[in-house]
A protein has these predicted regions:
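Hydrophobic-face positions in mid-chain alpha helices that act as interaction patches
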Residues: 172, 196-318, 322, 361, ...
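Inward-facing hydrophobic residues that define packing positions of alpha-helical scaffold repeats
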Residues: 61-64, 68, 137, 144, ...
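Acidic, glycine-rich segments characteristic of secretory precursors and extracytoplasmic regions
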Residues: 1-19, 416-422
Length: 422
């Protein structure tokens, strides 16, 4: 599947468009970017951008369905068919879920019978009908739960030359990534107990562990985090995209972080938040210094020493990481088990070099929001978080806010989707 293409997770749903919608990134003078950050969904250029995402995602969903329809695979000698099928089902659910998050109202703030999207379950030229938002989620959960049943516990870093498909499990939607996706979906649906159960399974039953604070630098720099990535996409050329959009400031599409981003990080307090220097650097351009989001810049490519990169590192894009599981638990337990919620919150903080929240201090939604912002800046998740919580979005220049509404949170479904039905 070409999930790494620029219209999807190679750019628009990771570091570019979706981060512009979150007001995390901006590009002064670029009309396309400025229309996006003003949520001008009636403009043809923005509608074309949304259609770009829509059609690309469904093309990839079709690829997953092609795998699921390939009966010959079942007869292949020594081929791990149940794993293959489980991953394809999980990918189908993962991609539909992101389309739902983009193109439909938030589940918890609308009626279940609100119109959703077409859920494509067959490899066919026939376009499936639109269905209700409730049915969308029913389909997503059905695919994920069947994937959970099919997938077996797999080592993450084992290499077996006889079955290459089973290598590099982080770049596959493995069992632990299915659990993580289920936690994400259930939280979006407001099903807190189920979200906690799956997030806890990832934390307690998977081999993933939070990296130490001294490991933060470079851990996401064009590679999948060895310790924290539940699922990511292999993408050998991600550096060229990151270099043009994030590292440089000479390209007409180059993105600047929001004006006040550093105020979110506790730079002036001790102990130090290790993410600050790991995620951002300053460059000089025209006699001025500018911050760049260097979180994903491959330091081996940047320094022309790609041959020195440790062989076990997987080049690519991180789509689901372990800290989110702690944040899901902390938020979902905030009212019912505040002690456990604080413990989850503190676990990530201390692994990023910060002090734990004292027992006498109450953990609040605002503190959780702040911590999520700092951890996931640039990773394409902040817009979805604002939407799920029905929060206003502070503008990139910190001068105003955009009130929460479907006008900003629901992208326009392409007109071509209605025109091509038969």
């Amino acid at each position: 599947a070409q999930m790494r293409q620029s219209s999807l997770y190679g750019s628009e749903l990771s570091i570019r468009g979706i981060e512009v919608l979150a007001q995390n990134m901006t590009c002064p003078g670029n009309d396309d970017i400025e229309m996006l950050q003003r949520y001008e969904y009636d403009k043809s250029d923005v509608q074309s951008w949304a259609e770009y995402i829509w059609t690309s995602m469904y093309a990839n969903i079709s690829n997953a369905n092609s795998v699921l329809s390939a009966d010959l695979v079942k007869q292949a000698k020594d081929f791990p068919y149940t794993t293959y099928k489980g991953e394809a089902l999980a990918l189908r659910a993962f991609m539909h879920f992101d389309l739902v998050r983009l193109f439909t109202p938030q589940y918890t703030t609308t009626q279940p019978q609100t119109t959703g999207i077409p859920y494509q379950t067959e490899f066919s030229l026939k376009t499936p009908d639109f269905e209700s938002l409730q049915k969308n989620y029913d389909h997503i959960l059905a695919d994920l739960l069947e994937a959970e049943r099919l997938l077996k516990v797999q080592p993450i870093h084992d290499y077996d030359a006889s079955t290459a498909f089973m290598n590099d499990r982080q770049s596959h939607l493995n069992l632990y990534a299915v659990w993580g996706t289920l936690a994400r979906v259930y939280q979006t649906m407001g099903e807190k107990e189920k979200a906690v159960a799956y997030a806890d399974s990832v934390i307690t039953k998977s081999p993933y562990r939070l990296k130490e604070k001294t490991e933060v630098v470079g851990d996401l720099a064009g590679v999948l985090s060895e310790k924290e990535t539940l699922f990511g996409i292999y993408y050998a050329d991600f550096y060229s995209t990151v270099s043009e959009l994030l590292q440089k400031r000479t390209f007409y599409q180059s993105l600047d972080p929001r004006s006040d981003f550093m105020l979110y990080y506790e730079r002036e307090s001790l102990p130090l938040d290790y993410r600050t220097s790991a995620y951002f650097t300053q460059i000089e351009a025209g006699g001025q210094y500018f911050y760049r989001l260097s979180k994903f810049t491959d330091i081996y490519e940047l320094n022309n020493i790609a041959g020195s990169r440790p062989s076990q590192l997987i080049l690519g894009i991180n789509l689901l990481r372990l800290p989110e599981m702690y944040y899901i638990m902390a938020e979902c337990l905030l009212e019912t088990d505040p002690v456990r919620a604080r413990a989850c919150y503190n676990e990530v903080r201390t692994h990023r070099g910060l002090s734990a929240l004292p027992e006498e201090s109450a953990l609040t939604q605002d503190l959780l929001d702040l911590e999520f912002f700092k951890e996931y800046f640039g990773e394409g998740q902040q817009f979805f978080r604002y939407k799920r919580l029905n929060q206003p979005i502070p503008s990139h220049d910190a001068k105003t806010t955009y009130p929460a509404s479907s006008k900003i949170y629901v992208l326009p479904i392409p007109n071509s989707e209605y025109a091509n039905r038969y």
